[in-house]
Amino acid sequence: MKYLFLLIVLVYSAVGLANPALDEQASDYQLAKTEQELAAEAVVDKLIMAYNAQNIRQFIELYAEDVEFYMYPQTLMFKGKEKLIERYGLMFKKMHCLKATSIKRVTHGSIVIDHETSEICSKEPGVVDKRSEFVTSYQVEAGKITKVVFFR
């Protein structure tokens, strides 16, 4: 009985893995992003590039004037571009390197949720002294980020 069960599981697994129709369905699903989702992802991609280049002007351009930053679940960290410039402008000036990488992304409508890694060189260029991993949610409306939620 034990061997019969293992044989059934093995055959079922082989059939499932060898079925190209299942692969096509999965890739069709991956390609089925809406224009809104693609546009939201493009904004977040530009944001990550500006962050990594430590280009405060390009970075700030991607945010709405009244952007809100939260720590999950509902703790308001700050609101508005002025506070954003204070916080990130200083960091961009002080750090020798900043590198964020999206390692997994889920997009639904205007919301992009990234599982990200971050590396910072605060003492000398090229020597990473802080690494972190976190999840960030970006809400994008009319090409601007209106809300950011950090999950740590």
Regions found by a protein language model. Give the residues of each.
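A solvent-exposed, acidic/Ser-Thr-rich amphipathic alpha-helical stretch
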Residues: I56-T107
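Short beta-strand edge/turn micro-motifs at domain boundaries
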Residues: R131-R152
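A short hydrophobic beta-strand element
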Residues: G109-S118
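Short, surface-exposed coil-to-beta transition loops
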Residues: L98-A100, H115, D129-V135
